[in-house]
Amino acid sequence: MSRPTRIYVVDNGGQWTHRIWRVLGEIGCDSKIIANTTPVEEIEADALVLSGGAPRITWESPKMGKCIDYLQQFDGPILGICVGLQLMALHCGGKVGPSDVPEYGLAKLRIIEEDDLFKGLPREFHVWESHNDEVKSAKGFTVLAVSDNCSVQAVKHLEKQYYGVQFHPEVNNTEHGEEILRNFAAVVKHRRD
């Protein structure tokens, strides 16, 4: 019997970081929350989730700790949530800026590109948003989903094992949030095995 998929949650100060950890545990992953200052060489995980958080990435990126190191040196899939996605996009040459319409609450997500992250899910469903900034251009990524007010709601990198979502799959209000995290865990397990 193989060991559970080990996915660590990098704490970027988000109010729902513990929910990511809890959902991952509920779906059978070996998960723990780690500080975003944890050195890469101390991380013994199959994958990372860069949690959301309060930093405005365009001028408060130092609050993201060693997340750039993780993107440069961690050898495994990474899922960026909210500010985690924004940092990932910026690091890969994209642009991040203030949202034309800041979002807080439910939004209708539309999947525009099939991918394992949304495997088995409907083409449209409601997700929980909480952001003032957003990815304006996602250089090096395929955009997987959009909403009425945000043209980059979910992405997958063209070459690296990077996934990102602007919304919060860990929040109860997000329909199919557990399935999205389960699908990410399946991608990680497939890569590991």
Regions found by a protein language model. Name each.
Residues G65-I81, Q86-E179, A186-V187:
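Pocket-forming structural segment of enzyme catalytic cores
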Residues P4-V10, G14-I81, C92, A186:
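Flexible gly/pro-rich beta->alpha loop and the following alpha-helix that scaffold active-site loops
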Residues V187-D193:
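Charged phosphate-binding loop/patch that engages nucleotide di/tri-phosphates or the phosphate backbone
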Residues S2-T5, V165:
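Active-site proximal loop and beta-alpha junction motif in alpha/beta enzyme cores
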Residues R3-P4, D30, T38-P39, E113-E124, ...:
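Short, glycine- and charge-enriched coil/turn segments that flank and shape catalytic ligand pockets
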